[in-house]
Amino acid sequence: MTLFRLALKGLTALVLALAPQFAAAEDEAPPSEAVTLGFIENIVVGNLGMKMTAKLDTGADTSSVHAYNVKVYQRGERDNWVKFRLIGKDGRAIRYDQNVIRFAQIKTKSGGLIRRPVIRLPLCVGGQWGRAEINLADRGDFEYEILIGREFLANRVLVDSGRTFIAAEECEQPDED
């Protein structure tokens, strides 16, 4: 086999090997509707318009909020529900009583596991409304009471980790839950 044919075969193999990576990169391009926001932003939680300051964290799968007086109980034979309170930036507290959609197992720094209830709540950041799966946690030791993870951010928000409070759009109240 000539050197030219050997080089051509090698080049063909390289192109075929890289083709799926280029195709995958095209599939992962952000949608044109995604808005760029800072890693810290003001958000609106729930339909009652509670304002909180959130950390937008692309390293977290799901969102987490500092909830007070969390009490899980059963309604019926198998339905888990949870009562809790959230406190906004203005000090206003809102009580919730919601269906638990699942329980998350969270690893602690010491290597143990904590079981947290996960609920769905409407959130808005930078004018982008959506429902987020949020685990109820004790975030008292953290600077921000709510952390927004990839599950909510995907296809809505691009996070600029070097900037804060850059949202241009305000969050108008939703018409429904």
Model-predicted regions and their roles:
Residues 9-19:
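Bacterial N-terminal signal peptides
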Residues 24-177:
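Pepsin/retropepsin-fold aspartyl endopeptidases
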